[in-house]
Regions:
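N-terminal glycine-rich phosphate-binding loop and ensuing alpha1 helix
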Residues: 1-66, 73-75, 80
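Hydrophobic packing residues within well-ordered alpha-helices of enzyme cores
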Residues: 61-65, 133, 286
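Short phosphate-binding loop-to-helix
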Residues: 69-114
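A C-terminal functional module that forms or caps the active site or interfaces directly
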Residues: 230-263
Length: 305
C-alpha cells in the first residue's frame, strides 16, 4: 500500500527561544527529531514524506533536511500561508500567528492522494505508533463504511509529560468499540511533587489521570478527510471570537466530525515514551534519550548517510 508521512513543520515554537526548534540537532551525528520519525515511518511501510513548511523556511529546510532525506524516501512540499484563505476572507493585517494545524493540513490537498499519517515535526513518537497506523490503514480500514474510517495513535499521558513545565494534550475518551468518542484540549498538564495538575481552556482546574490516553497529533487519515477540513474552515473563520489568535485545530475538527457522524476514529495504543522540545531545557533530555536508544540498538549510530 502506498502511504505518506505528512510532517507539520511550519510552526516556530514561541516558548523555545532562539532558532527554529525543529531544526535543533539531538542525535549523535547532528540528527534532528524528525529524522527519527522519517526513519520509523519508512520502516513501518510509508514510502513518501510531505513537509508542510512556510515559504520563508524553504531554502534552509531543503538544505538542512529535504536534500539529505530525499536519497532515502520520496519528498514533496506543501506550504502553509497566512493569506491562503477561502474566497471572501482576508487575513487581518495585525495577525502573525499561523491559522493552526487544520489550515496547515489543508495545504496538502491535491498533493497527497493516498492514506497518510500526520505528525508534528518536533515530537518524537517512537516506532509503535507508525506501525499500528500503517497496519490499520493497510489491513483493517473499512473502505465501504458510510463514515470515513480513520485512526489515531493514543499515547499514555504519563509517557508524554515534560520535566520542565506544563504541556497541552488532547485527552481522549474511547467508546466500547475502541472508537474515539471525545477529545478535550487540556492545558498546563504537569506532575509536580507527585501531584498531577491541569486546567481547561478557561483556566479552570481539570481532573486528569496519569493513565489517560492522549493525542499527540498523530492521526491516520485519508484524502477524503481533507474535504471535511476544507468545508469547516470558512465556518471557523466566520465564527472567530479573536481574529488575531484563534486557530483552526485538527483535534477540534476531528472531534466535531465524530459528533456529526462523518468519521469514526480507531484508537490504537502506543506504549512508547514521547519526547519533544517544548521547552529549551528539554533538549538535553531528548539528546540523552536518543543516545540511549542508539546504545540499545533501536537506531543505528547514523540514520541517513
Amino acid at each position: 500500500m502506498n502511504a505518506t508521512l505528512v510532517v507539520m513543520a511550519a510552526g516556530i515554537g514561541s516558548r523555545f527561544g532562539g532558532g527554529i526548534k525543529q531544526l535543533a540537532p539531538v542525535g549523535p551525528n547532528g540528527e534532528i527529531i524528525m529524522d527519527y520519525s522519517i526513519y520509523d515511518a519508512k520502516e513501518a511501510g510509508f514510502n513518501k514524506v510531505v513537509f508542510i513548511i512556510r515559504h520563508d523556511l524553504e531554502k534552509d529546510f531543503k538544505e538542512i533536511i529535504g536534500d539529505r532525506v530525499k536519497k532515502y524516501i520520496d519528498v514533496d512540499y506543501a506550504f502553509q500561508d497566512l493569506n491562503d484563505l477561502p474566497e471572501g476572507f482576508e487575513c487581518p493585517k495585525e495577525r502573525s500567528k499561523p491559522w493552526g494545524t487544520g489550515q496547515a493540513l489543508l495545504s496538502v490537498k491535491g498533493i497527497v492522494n493516498e492514506p497518510f499519517v500526520v505528525i508534528n515535526a518536533d515530537d518524537y513518537y517512537g516506532k509503535e505508533g507508525f506501525k499500528v497506523i500503517y497496519d490499520y490503514m493497510a489491513n483493517k480500514m473499512d473502505k465501504n463504511s458510510k463514515k470515513l474510517d480513520l485512526c489515531m495513535a493514543g499515547f499514555v499521558l504519563k509517557n508524554t509529560l515534560s520535566d520542565n513545565g506544563g504541556v497541552t494534550r488532547g485527552v481522549c475518551k474511547a467508546d466500547a468499540n475502541n472508537k474515539l468518542a471525545d477529545v478535550t484540549e487540556t492545558f498546563e498538564i504537569e506532575l509536580k511533587d507527585g501531584v498531577l495538575n491541569a486546567v481547561d481552556e478557561n483556566g479552570n482546574k481539570r481532573d486528569v489521570n496519569l493513565d489517560d490516553i492522549v493525542s499527540m497529533n498523530m492521526w491516520g487519515l485519508t484524502p477524503e478527510f481533507l474535504d471535511i477540513l476544507e468545508e469547516g474552515f470558512p465556518k471557523f473563520l466566520g465564527n472567530m471570537t479573536n481574529e488575531l489568535k484563534n486557530e483552526y485545530l485538527l483535534p477540534s475538527v476531528i472531534d466535531e466530525a465524530i459528533k456529526a457522524d462523518k468519521i469514526s476514529v480507531e484508537v490504537l495504543k502506543s506504549h512508547d515514551k514521547w519526547f519533544g522540545v517544548t521547552y529549551k531545557e528539554d533538549k538535553e533530555i531528548v539528546v540523552n534519550s536518543i543516545r540511549a536508544l542508539v546504545d540499545k540498538g533501536v537506531y543505528p549510530d547514523k540514520i541517513f548517510d
